[in-house]
Amino acid sequence: MAEFVEADNAEAIIARIETKSRKIESLLKQYKHVEALKTALEGSPPKTRDERCKSANWIVVHRALMAIKDIDGMLNALDVEYYDILMKYLYRGLSTGDRPTCDQCLKIHEKLTERAGLGCILRCLTDTINTV
């Protein structure tokens, strides 16, 4: 079972997410969109139940997701170990109801499902411990 940190450590997690956010912004300015997404997905989801941490991390992942233009190229460059966590964030994006976010998440979802198969969806939906 995953070990979760207590809420009093949430500030430390948020500080790490802020550092990650600055790195991602730098990568995006250099047009390294896939590298930014990989960086955003690293260490995700945060090992906490604190919603502030999860929301802060979602904002970082969302920023990287929205910058992706070449979905096939992104999936070719992305290691398969990232597929399940990416799928979780796609569902989080779909749950926002924001039209541009949903459109992007659906495009990526379609290509990711073709690549990773239905097992990726099932693992994402049945993992109730490591939520994003």
From Swiss-Prot:
Annotated InterPro entries: ARPC5 (IPR006789), ARPC5_sf (IPR036743)
This protein's record includes keyword Cytoplasm: yes
GO biological process: actin cytoskeleton organization; actin filament organization; actin filament polymerization; Arp2/3 complex-mediated actin nucleation; multidimensional cell growth; regulation of actin filament polymerization; trichome morphogenesis
GO molecular function: actin binding
Phenotype upon gene inactivation: Distorted trichomes and altered epidermal cell types.
Subcellular location as annotated: Cytoplasm, Cytoskeleton; Cell projection
Top-level taxon of origin: Eukaryota
UniProt keyword Cytoplasm present: yes
Full protein name: Actin-related protein 2/3 complex subunit 5A
The organism of origin for this protein: Arabidopsis thaliana
